[in-house]
């Protein structure tokens, strides 16, 4: 949301803060009773839930100790550093009770009563059951405590005022007062701990999920997460459930390779899930119909297509083949690819400008790389080749302009590589 719009709401927000000041403490007082002492089975269950929630993906920083936090999370409103969730008493959650943990997971409230920023995806985690919360808590109590205090968040005024989250919650958060593990295991994972919509659902100006647009694809920090609906061109409509499960488990299938932020998800989370879990996710995603099928795009300029084809033959065909079919499971095919035909070309442009590397998993231990072409191709050339691959071999997608490329090039060059987060 533009800052002037947010400032115009300051009076309302201040009132919301005043109203919120008492209920915060009441939430902590009225929380359910503390969980009983953990046993080995509960800890093991919690460890598996931490995998489902991709906790390492945000709470591990490069070169840091496991779950000690400090990873910078890019949001549209500034940078937030992930928390230390080890049981260290001074810098982690070592003094938290099971009730404190439940309040954080379920309501977005810290042990001291302050609101959590929804970069921590409590709007999804609220669907976790109390038994799941207690198991996660039991597991985190067993990890090695690390004395490490993450850097202070870098949020400009007024986004650095935590009580503004109260207003955000009014618009975007509904606590699940009776969470269950149903109706299907896949739905519980996707809508709950898996928090797939945090990236794959389009966002409002304030960073909340757009209502009625679940899993239709979302833009975040110079990436576009494609739709997970039944959209045939820009979603998973052409993917059998087995292909979805294979992609989540191994990072590759005959249609796509995981890299970028999704590569992190596969590395830390889905590749470590049980086969039954990835199969359940796949089965649920196949029930998501395309509420808004991607419309056909106008035919691109033939001159631009000719320029793009020449660049493609010179620079891309060696790996992706002249017909775009490449070598499936090694170099992803381009015909019919959702990421290629998405309404937003950001990820395709990001691959061309920055290059990418596929994730390494136990099933596919050798990562494969695509080089950066930012040094070699100017904005018009990148736009031309992107337009070409988005509109060849049966693909249809809007043409890309040199201006779009220039804008993304500046953003990518200006920011260090950090973990993206769709909301604050």
Model-derived features with residue positions:
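Acidic/histidine-rich, surface-exposed loop or edge segments in extracytoplasmic proteins
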Residues: 79-87, 223-229
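Bacterial N-terminal signal peptides that target proteins for export
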Residues: 1-12, 18-22
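Glycine-rich, acidic and aromatic/proline-enriched surface loops and short helix-turn segments
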Residues: 107-110, 250-254, 354
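Aromatic- and charge-enriched surface segment that lines or borders ligand/interaction sites
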Residues: 93-109, 113, 135, 237-241
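Extended, polar beta-sheet/loop recognition surfaces of beta-rich domains
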Residues: 241, 248, 335-384
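Flexible coil segments in periplasmic/lumen-exposed cytochrome c-class electron-transfer proteins
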Residues: 30-35, 39-41, 52, 60-80, ...
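C-terminal structural cap/anchor segments
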Residues: 309-350, 366
């Amino acid at each position: 949301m533009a800052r002037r719009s947010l400032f115009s709401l300051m009076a309302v927000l201040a009132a919301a803060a005043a109203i919120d000041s008492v209920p915060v403490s009441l939430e902590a007082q009225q929380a359910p009773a503390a969980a009983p002492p953990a046993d080995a089975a509960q800890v093991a269950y919690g460890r598996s839930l931490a995998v489902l929630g991709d906790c390492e993906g945000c709470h591990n920083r490069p070169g840091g100790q496991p779950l000690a936090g400090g990873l910078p999370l890019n949001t549209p409103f500034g940078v937030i550093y992930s928390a230390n969730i080890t049981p260290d008493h001074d810098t982690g959650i070592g003094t938290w009770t099971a009730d404190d943990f439940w309040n954080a997971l379920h309501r977005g409230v810290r042990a001291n009563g302050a609101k959590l920023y929804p970069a921590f995806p409590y709007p999804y985690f609220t669907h976790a059951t109390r038994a799941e919360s207690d198991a996660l808590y039991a597991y985190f109590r067993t990890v090695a405590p690390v004395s490490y205090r993450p850097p202070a968040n870098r949020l400009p005024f007024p986004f650095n005022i935590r009580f503004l989250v109260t207003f955000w919650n009014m618009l975007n958060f509904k606590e699940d007062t009776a969470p269950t593990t149903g109706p299907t295991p896949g739905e519980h994972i996707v809508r709950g701990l898996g928090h797939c919509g945090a990236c794959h659902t389009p966002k409002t100006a304030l960073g909340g999920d757009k209502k009625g647009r679940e899993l239709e694809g979302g833009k975040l920090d110079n990436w576009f997460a494609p739709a997970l609906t039944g959209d045939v061109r820009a979603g998973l409509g052409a993917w059998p459930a087995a292909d979805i499960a294979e992609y989540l488990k191994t990072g590759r299938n005959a249609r796509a390779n995981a890299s970028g932020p999704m590569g992190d998800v596969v590395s830390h989370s889905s590749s470590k899930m049980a086969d039954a879990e990835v199969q359940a996710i796949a089965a649920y995603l196949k029930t998501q119909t395309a509420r808004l099928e991607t419309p056909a795009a106008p035919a691109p300029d033939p001159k631009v297509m000719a320029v793009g084809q020449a660049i493609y033959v010179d620079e891309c065909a060696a790996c992706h083949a002249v017909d775009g079919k490449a070598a499936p499971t090694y170099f992803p095919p381009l015909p019919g690819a959702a990421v290629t035909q998405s309404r937003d070309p950001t990820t395709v442009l990001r691959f061309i400008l920055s290059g990418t590397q596929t994730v390494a998993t136990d099933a596919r231990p050798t990562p494969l790389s695509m080089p950066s072409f930012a040094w070699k191709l100017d904005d018009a050339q990148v736009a031309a080749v992107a337009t070409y691959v988005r509109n060849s071999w049966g693909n249809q997608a809007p043409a890309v302009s040199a201006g779009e490329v220039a804008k993304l090039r500046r953003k990518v060059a200006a920011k260090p590589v950090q973990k993206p987060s769709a909301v604050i």
